[in-house]
Every structure is written in structure tokens, then in C-alpha cells.
Amino acid sequence: MASHIGKLPIAIPAGVEVKIEGQNFSAKGAKGSDSYVVPEGITAAVEGNEIVLTAADDLRPTRAKHGLARSIMAGMVKGVHDGYSKTLEIVGTGYRAVAKGKGIEFFLGYSHTITVNPPEGITLKVTDANHVVVEGTDKQVVGQVAANIRKLRAPEPYKGKGIKYADERILRKAGKAGK
């Protein structure tokens, strides 16, 4: 019984260069490059225009690593080819974002402004005063940067003010009942 996810081959799109040297996997594409160390007990090989992963044995930890390695490598191939992005929406009177160098300055109703500088490989764009786009090749880092920005002023349930993902629905609560 092998890992259902791990046994699926990863298609290599045109324009993506893949290298496997021992346990080191690297992918290079139009959007950038990324590398990953394949866990022990898992071997990766390029067959035609696909990457195939095989597990050394059928033990549960190996099966788990098999599926994990396949998912991470598939994400890397997609990331260097297409890239990943998350859009954040700023809701609230006077709340806005302004591009400042490579970073973004947020005005979120605090007594001070908050400046966010992106890590290496991540770009931040302000499409308008109320929308910020986080882009990069690494899915995990893009999601983490977006989550850190959202955390600056998480949406509150009464008026929905704060920073939310563009596709996120905020569960609203009724205010207190008056007499």
C-alpha cells in the first residue's frame, strides 16, 4: 500500500529546468528558482517530462514523507513556472496601504503607521489603496507573509473592519440589542 499522493507523477511544464543530484532537488523557471532536500527513504527520478518519486519501503512514516515530498516538489515546479499570489483587502474608514520602496506602509487606525518589508523572493504590490497583492515562487512563504500582514489588523466580526483575504468571508455578529 503506497502513498496515494506520492505515487502520482509530477508533470514538468515547458520552460522549467529540473535537476536531481542525490537527495537534492532543484527547479528553475521563468519566475525564479527553488531547491528542496528529498527526505531519506524517498528517491526522485526524471522520466521523460515527469518526475517520479518512489519509496524505499511501505512503512507508515515513509508513506507520509512520500506524499509530503511529492506535494512540496509539485508546488515548487508550479511556483517557478506560474508563481503564487494572495490578494488582501483592507476594509475600514481611513485604513489604507501605500507602497514605500520595496515595502508597504499601512495606515490601520493605530497611532502609528506600520511598515512591512518583504523577505527575499517575495514582491508586494499595492493595486489601489485598499488592495495588496503578495507574490512569489514559494507557496509557504507567500502564505506566511500574507498571514503576517492580515494579523496586523485582523477583521473584527461586528463591522468587518481590518485586513482580510480577497476570497475570505467574515462571519458577522449582531450588535448588542438596545432597550
From Swiss-Prot:
GO molecular function: rRNA binding; structural constituent of ribosome
Keywords for this protein: Ribonucleoprotein, Ribosomal protein, RNA-binding, rRNA-binding
GO cellular component: cytosolic large ribosomal subunit
GO biological process: cytoplasmic translation
Listed NCBIfam families: L6_bact (TIGR03654)
Similarity comment text for this entry: Belongs to the universal ribosomal protein uL6 family.
Function description: This protein binds to the 23S rRNA, and is important in its secondary structure. It is located near the subunit interface in the base of the L7/L12 stalk, and near the tRNA binding site of the peptidyltransferase center.
Quaternary structure note: Part of the 50S ribosomal subunit.
Protein's UniProt name: Large ribosomal subunit protein uL6
Species assigned in the record: Bifidobacterium longum subsp. infantis (strain ATCC 15697 / DSM 20088 / JCM 1222 / NCTC 11817 / S12)
